[in-house]
Every structure is written in C-alpha cells, then in structure tokens.
Regions:
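Short helix-capping/linker turns of helical repeat alpha-solenoids
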Residues: 23-26, 38-40, 44-45, 65-71, ...
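Fold-core signature of tandem repeat domains
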Residues: 63, 104, 115, 186, ...
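Short coil/turn linking the two alpha-helices of tandem helical-hairpin repeats
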Residues: 4-7, 33, 37-49, 75-90, ...
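TPR/TPR-like (Sel1-like) alpha-helical repeat modules
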Residues: 56-64, 136-138, 283-293, 322-337
C-alpha cells in the first residue's frame, strides 16, 4: 500500500482516493478514529475506549493515506484539522466530497450517512460542490426582477435582486438534503447513527417520522432507539410492546432501558393494564435498579435509592444488608440524589 511519502503529485493522491483497494487502509483508520472518539461518535453501549490521542493519530493517518471518508470526517472531530494536518492533506474537501458522494449514489450506506452529516452540520460552507447543491443556478437580471416582484418579504426581494439565497432557505435546503441521505442510509441498514435524523423530525414537529426512524433503527439493533420506541409505546398505552423494547434495550446495556424495565417489574406505574400485563417481580426489579445505578445517566441516583429502599423494607424478602444499603445511598449522593441519601 502506498504511504504518504510515496505520493508525489495531486494526481497520485486522487488515483489512490478513487481506488477502494488502494485507500482501504486509510478508510480503516478513519473508522477506527471514530471508534476512539467516544460515545458522541459511536454509541454509548458499545463501550469502545475513548482515546483522544489515538483518535487524532488514526484520523491523521487516514487523511495522509488519501481517505475521502477520513478527510470529511475530520470536519466533525474538533481540533483534527490543525494547520499542519491541513498542509499535509493529499486531497481537498471537494475531492473527498465528490468521491464519497459518488459511492453514496451507488448505495453505500456509510457514505450516505457521511453526506447527510455534511448537510446536517452545515459543513457545506467548507465544500464548494456541496454548497452548490443548496443554491439554484445564477439567474439573469430579468428573472431576478420577476422573482423579486413575487417575493413575500423585503428580505426575500433584496435577496432575489442580489441573486443570493436567504439563510432560511439555505438551511431548509440543507435540512432536506440531510434527511434524504440519512433516510437512504437507514433504508440500507445503517442504524447506529440515526439520532440526527430523528432530531431533525422532532425539530420540525414531524413526530410521525421521528417515531418511524426510531422504530426502524430499533429493529435494526440501535439500543437508544429501542428506548425511544419503548417510551413511545408506553405513552400510548402499549405496555407489552414497551416491555419488549425495554427488555431488548436492557440486554444491550442501554442505561435508561434498564431503569424503565426495573420500573415495569416493580409496577412503579399506577396503570391497571400495565399491572395486568407485566409480571410483578420486585427482586428482579431491585437487581435491575442496582445495575442501572452503576451507569452514568440522569436517573442513576434514583435507581440507587430504589435499590436501597428495596433492602431497607425487605421487599421480596431481600435481606437487611446495611453495608449494601450504605453503598447504594452513597452512590445516590454522588449522583445528585442528596435529599434522600442516608448519613
């Protein structure tokens, strides 16, 4: 495989960038960089080790090995495009975008996701060919005047005369392209990174599509989307379906799903249909509360206290273990549940 030291010209770099076999090591480094970048770039339940130094090393190796994916991905990982790295870039952002866009059009799910991310995060302002997709072709003065006469606001009229596109329109166009490519990636089975697509629909108050995205991704194995789908089922009184999704999420160590499943077994919710449908198992619930308490999420303190109360009140014939109770209440205190923490 060619190293960056073997690349003498831009033509050499583009030849590698356009050849999947020649750039495969660079692409592998790009994906490895994402793994090391932490849960914001993978998914929390994967438990991949977060290592900033390895992230930058892998990403820089990827860029120097002419990976279009790595080159574009660097726009998303803060601090990656240092002046030194940008100087060593073998291909431009435009070259990288063109190559990834071509593979996205051929049906590559990860490339489709990368293109969607370009428009979601508005990285098009660094990529001429992406920016061009958001703006219509130049119009003659005659057409500009005609358009200005039919504009709904003074701002739109001025923009029409200047031949520019209002920021609101650019944002709408970018959002539409992001949705298009994220949906294509989801349809092709890429489920782990669909939070951005769901968030777009939520921001647009398009809750039907937000639910569709969550359920599709959940069915494909996304733990967080299992939680969201379960919560949606719960809110709509579909307790058996919610229980199923919380169980699946908990099996993949999704923190909130573990807590919700514990609440279900504990019959925490005062809903007759839930209590008729879900078996009451306080011992299993306390075990799940203890498991959830070890996680880092907003309700971890609550789950620690629930587990402590289970032992304090002998729920399900649990032993009165003051050492364990002290550990659990201390855990609750360290996770911002000070009000009920015992001394």
């Amino acid at each position: 495989t060619l190293l960056e030291s073997d690349i003498d010209t831009k033509e050499d770099a583009l030849k590698i960038a356009n050849d999947p076999e020649a750039r495969e090591l660079g692409d592998a480094y790009a994906l490895l960089a994402r793994v090391y970048a932490g849960p914001r770039f993978t998914w929390e339940e994967s438990n991949f080790p977060e290592d900033n130094m390895r992230t930058y090393q892998c990403l820089h190796d990827s860029i120097r090995r002419c990976s279009p994916i790595g080159t574009l991905q660097a726009l998303r990982i803060k601090g990656s495009i240092t002046p030194t790295v940008e100087k060593d870039m073998q291909i431009s952002f435009d070259d990288a975008f063109r190559i990834v866009y071509d593979h996205a059009n051929r049906g590559d799910a990860y490339c489709q996701y990368v293109i969607g991310n370009i428009f979601f995060w508005r990285d098009d302002n660094r990529i001429d060919s992406a920016e061009a997709m958001l703006t219509p072709p130049p119009m003659s003065w005659t057409k500009r005047i005609q358009k200005s006469l039919t504009a709904n606001s003074v701002q739109d009229r001025i923009a029409a005369l200047q031949g520019t596109v209002p920021d609101e329109t650019l944002q709408e166009n970018a959002s539409n392209l992001a949705k298009e490519w994220f949906n294509k990636a989801l349809d092709n089975g890429l489920a782990m990174f669909q939070g951005n697509l769901r968030n777009i629909y939520i921001d647009e108050a398009d809750f039907s599509n937000a639910r569709r995205v969550a359920k599709t991704a959940a069915e494909l194995g996304n733990p967080a989307m299992m939680l969201y789908t379960g919560l949606d089922c719960h809110e709509n009184g579909k307790f058996e379906d919610a229980f199923t999704w919380f169980t699946k999420g908990a099996a993949l160590s999704q923190s909130e799903s573990i807590a919700e499943l514990a609440d279900y077994y504990y019959h925490f919710y005062d809903a007759k249909n839930l209590r008729c449908t879900i078996p009451y198992d306080p011992v299993k619930a306390i075990g799940l509360y203890r498991r959830a308490a070890t996680k880092q999420f907003s309700d971890a303190g609550y789950t620690a206290l629930q587990a402590a109360f289970g032992y304090i009140f002998h729920i399900g014939h649990l032993p009165l273990d003051w050492g364990l109770i002290a550990d659990l209440t201390h855990m609750a205190a360290t996770k911002d549940r000070f009000m009920f923490a015992l001394p």
